[in-house]
């Protein structure tokens, strides 16, 4: 390991610590992530020949630019997907589209609401992606829970439920999509064998953390729920909901049919929804006194939390730098050597690691390191691949910045890293380990 590589690791550790201590330093995590990203890539440029053997000096600059653009292009698909999904959910919410979901979940019991929210999130995240599910559920939650100290508990369990629900579905999480696309797992296999472990991984933390909630709910003020829905008819409200939520469900189908990245599907849904709502406002006589629809949508676009987007950019580009200098590969090889090929320990540790760094390069590294075999743990639907799908997905819940769902909730509900680590992480870890144990028992005695 070169001196430059060590410096890059030090920058990552220091930056990560500052992000974790945001509540103490009062420095926005997005600013730290961007500084960390630039510092790592600048260090990389000091002596790039160490990481690009065989590339001549006159071609180094061009090659590095290509590498950075490739990573940025890949990461941008996630960022545009997030921006599109957040805007769609905001539009649906403005038209009162989530009111019937709110009415379905409504109860006076705080703990009763928690179980309903967790169950719905778990189911939705198997169909939608984790980020979209988290955004939708938090928007609904804001209509039900006024107290922010209670709401961040609900939001934290939404993170856990979204990641758990995505782990047993071939389209529920980006890592399971990766494993499914390369043929490491099958849809039937991963659903059949990971459904119970995933359910256990969220059931136990919910059972534990429900005791943080006491008393009855106080409904939010009705005045805070004034939306654009007031100028539209009942069927138009329902049409907006069907187009918005149905469109989100359609995104993975669109991806399967066209092989285009998911963000293209999200942009399609946003474009259709935007066009339809403008037509509704144009046809509505009441809308003429309620403001211009174009202005409304422009305002909604302005509500996208750019600090969350930039935080994503900084973190993912930093991890890309760690990937380029070979740190993730070394970690993977070290794990295999340390745990002597014990798949439960290797994948279990990868899951814990995925709560610190992005799970996508970790899973990509594993796919590259361990080729498919005809039989054994590395066969299709083998123990290693199914455990990897579970651990990389659910393990990201241990720390709030370990998953896209966590980062989104962190930005939307202003949950601090420290608060989550103190109040949620330990319960998430217990659920995570319980899921692994249940998978072992099922694999040993049932399947």
Regions found by a protein language model. Name each.
Residues 6-15, 26-58, 75-87, 237-247, ...:
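Hydrophobic mid-bilayer segments of alpha-helices in multi-pass membrane transport proteins
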Residues 73, 95, 102-104, 117, ...:
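Transmembrane helical segments that form the transport core of multi-pass membrane transport proteins
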Residues 73-83, 189-205, 258, 262-271, ...:
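Alpha-helical transmembrane segments
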């Amino acid at each position: 390991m070169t001196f430059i590589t060590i410096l890059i690791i030090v920058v990552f550790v220091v930056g990560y610590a500052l992000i974790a201590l945001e509540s103490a330093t009062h420095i926005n995590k997005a600013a730290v992530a961007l500084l960390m990203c630039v510092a790592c890539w600048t260090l990389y440029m000091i002596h790039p020949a160490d990481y690009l053997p065989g590339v001549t000096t006159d071609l180094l600059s061009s090659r590095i630019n290509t590498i950075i653009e490739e990573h940025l292009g890949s990461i941008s698909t996630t960022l545009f997907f997030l921006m599109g999904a957040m805007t769609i959910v905001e539009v649906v919410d403005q038209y009162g589209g989530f009111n019937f979901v709110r009415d379905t979940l409504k109860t006076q019991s705080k703990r009763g609401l928690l179980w309903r929210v967790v169950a719905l999130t778990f189911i939705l995240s198997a169909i939608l992606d984790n980020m979209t599910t988290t955004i939708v559920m938090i928007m609904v939650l804001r209509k039900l829970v006024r107290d922010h100290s209670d709401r961040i508990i609900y939001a934290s369990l939404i993170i856990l439920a979204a990641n758990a629900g995505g782990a047993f579905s071939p389209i529920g999480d980006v890592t399971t999509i990766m494993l499914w696309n390369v043929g490491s797992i099958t849809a039937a296999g991963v659903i059949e064998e990971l459904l119970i472990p995933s359910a256990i991984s969220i059931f136990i933390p919910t059972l534990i953390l429900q005791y943080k909630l006491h008393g009855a709910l106080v409904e939010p003020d009705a005045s805070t729920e004034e939306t654009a829905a007031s100028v539209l008819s009942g069927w138009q409200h329902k049409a907006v909901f069907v187009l918005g939520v149905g469109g989100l469900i359609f995104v993975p189908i669109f991806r399967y049919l066209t092989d285009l990245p998911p963000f293209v599907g999200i942009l399609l849904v946003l474009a259709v929804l935007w066009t339809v709502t403008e037509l509704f406002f144009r046809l509505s006589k009441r809308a003429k006194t309620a403001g211009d629809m174009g202005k409304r949508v422009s305002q909604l676009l302005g509500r996208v939390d750019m600090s969350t987007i930039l935080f994503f950019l900084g973190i993912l580009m930093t991890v890309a730098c760690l990937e380029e200098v070979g740190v993730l590969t070394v970690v993977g090889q070290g794990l295999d050597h340390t745990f002597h090929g014990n798949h439960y320990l290797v994948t279990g540790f990868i899951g814990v690691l995925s709560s610190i760094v992005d799970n996508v390069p970790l899973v990509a590294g594993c796919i590259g390191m361990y080729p498919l075999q005809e039989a054994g743990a590395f066969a299709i639907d083998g123990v290693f691949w199914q455990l990897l799908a579970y651990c990389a997905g659910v393990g990201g819940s241990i720390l709030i910045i370990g998953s896209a769902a966590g980062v989104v909730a962190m930005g939307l509900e202003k949950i601090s890293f420290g608060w989550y680590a103190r109040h949620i992480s330990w319960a998430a870890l217990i659920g995570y380990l319980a899921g692994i144990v249940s998978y072992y028992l099922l694999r040993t005695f049932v399947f």
